[in-house]
UniProtKB/Swiss-Prot annotation:
It comes from Cryptococcus neoformans var. neoformans serotype D (strain B-3501A). GO terms for molecular function: metal ion binding; mRNA 5'-diphosphatase activity; nuclease activity; nucleotide binding; RNA binding; RNA NAD+-cap (NAD+-forming) hydrolase activity. Belongs to the DXO/Dom3Z family. Keywords: Hydrolase, Metal-binding, mRNA processing, Nuclease, Nucleotide-binding, Nucleus, RNA-binding. Decapping enzyme for NAD-capped RNAs: specifically hydrolyzes the nicotinamide adenine dinucleotide (NAD) cap from a subset of RNAs by removing the entire NAD moiety from the 5'-end of an NAD-capped RNA. The NAD-cap is present at the 5'-end of some RNAs and snoRNAs. In contrast to the canonical 5'-end N7 methylguanosine (m7G) cap, the NAD cap promotes mRNA decay. Also acts as a non-canonical decapping enzyme that removes the entire cap structure of m7G capped or incompletely capped RNAs. One of its GO terms (cellular component) is nucleus. The gene is RAI1. Its EC number is 3.6.1.-. This is Decapping nuclease RAI1.
């Protein structure tokens, strides 16, 4: 097994792979306790935020979720929930991951500052992909973010002013306030898609839906993404915003969210204006500029290139391929005394060097997680041992 495999950068002249329209297969909610409920309990309804509202509202009352590593738990639990009820889960031969991982892959051609690493393992015909976030990196990021804590909070406050929760708005808040921020609460969509011939199964948080409060889930066509940005005051601000539109487009496009609403705030956190963007049209807004800062074609080529790279190298190391007798064979596992190990891979990106993949080695069950990633009981279920 090669120690390290470099990823060749895609040729811009190559054909542009298509991105299949996402198909919603499941939704689930994180409740205020962070527990998962396989329903729309945490789905919120869009309501236009009042201009002039203060996006520092409720900062001292906020509840932030514990900084615990959840890996791919919500996504894989959803797949098990679907399949054990006779419904379709992922399509084999592709990648199962969070929307945030694919956002990094699709925007890679234009990332000039931040390196990252991801962990990949193969199981039951799919590559599972998550962020490699060692404790020292997490601590460093937390220190850096603490200086911008209030600015980061403004995005959550904008969501509160822009949404009506299932239980309705509290009666004691300012106009439009949807309730104090609790970052435990999330509503997530799970979709099937594909980049070219490579199947994708993706989960990601969705901010709200455009529907009457109290009405049922309208599906992907009613989903909306909410963002904040500083008021644009000069060409430099505008250029920065066009670059930010790349990430806004990628996040929404990957999950099939048709609209992005951006609230523009001043330095004091006061909402000054709002603009709604059609996700599919965002690339055209950038394309008409004299010097467009990004192209969706290069993004799609990048996503396909990395996904193809991963499936080609990681899928053959699936233990159900290398140890086919294990599937459903409880006796063999009992005699071995343990599950066959996962082959753990690391996908590393550096803006100056590009992307490379290397095998970390075989890792069994560590602290209840196979390969350090997937819960042991989920892996046993996938292997037909439950």
């Amino acid at each position: 097994m090669p120690h390290s495999i470099p990823l060749l950068r895609p040729n811009p002249a190559d054909p542009v792979p298509s991105y299949r329209l996402p198909h919603l297969i499941h939704t689930y909610s994180h409740l205020p306790t962070r527990a998962i409920s396989h329903d729309d309990a945490s789905m919120a309804y869009y309501s236009l935020a009042p201009i002039g509202c203060n996006l520092t509202e409720g900062f001292e009352r906020r509840i932030e979720r514990e900084d615990e590593e959840e890996h791919l738990d919500g996504l894989v639990e959803s797949l098990e929930w679907l399949i054990t009820r006779g419904r379709k889960g992922e399509r084999k031969g592709g990648i199962i991951t969070w929307r945030g991982m694919l956002t990094r892959l699709i925007t890679m051609p234009y990332e000039t500052r931040d390196p990252w690493e991801m962990t990949a393992i193969a199981l039951d015909g799919s590559v599972y992909l998550e962020l490699w976030d060692p404790p020292e990196e997490k601590a460093k990021r937390k220190r850096e973010q603490s200086a911008w804590e209030k600015q980061g909070y403004m995005g959550y406050a904008y969501e509160s002013f822009s949404t009506i929760p299932q239980e309705g708005r509290p009666g004691n808040g300012p106009e439009g306030w949807g309730g104090d921020v609790n970052t435990n609460v999330q509503w997530a969509n799970v979709v099937r898609s594909a980049i070219g011939e490579i199947p994708l199964c993706i989960a990601g948080e969705v901010d709200c839906v455009k529907a009457e409060p109290g009405s049922p889930n309208p599906g992907l066509s009613g989903c909306m993404e909410l963002k904040t940005n500083k008021v644009i005051q000069h060409p430099g601000h505008e250029a920065m915003f066009h670059k930010k539109l790349l990430k806004h487009w990628a996040q929404s496009w990957l999950l099939g969210i048709p609209e992005v609403v951006v609230g523009f705030r001043d330095d004091d956190g006061i909402l000054r204006s709002q603009t709604t963007f059609d996700t599919a049209k965002i690339p055209y807004l950038v394309e008409v500029l004299n010097k467009p800062s990004w192209s969706p074609n290069r993004c799609l080529q990048s996503l396909h290139s990395v996904c193809s790279f991963l499936t080609k190298n990681v899928l053959p190391t699936d233990p159900l391929v290398t140890y086919p007798h294990i599937r459903g064979n409880r006796q063999a596992v009992k005699e071995a005394g343990e599950l066959p190990p996962a082959v753990v891979w690391r996908l590393a990106f550096d803006p100056k060097k590009g992307c490379e993949l290397h095998a970390v080695g075989e890792v069994g069950v560590v602290d209840g997680r196979w390969g350090g990633m997937l819960k042991e009981e989920y892996v046993r279920w996938r292997m037909g041992l439950e």
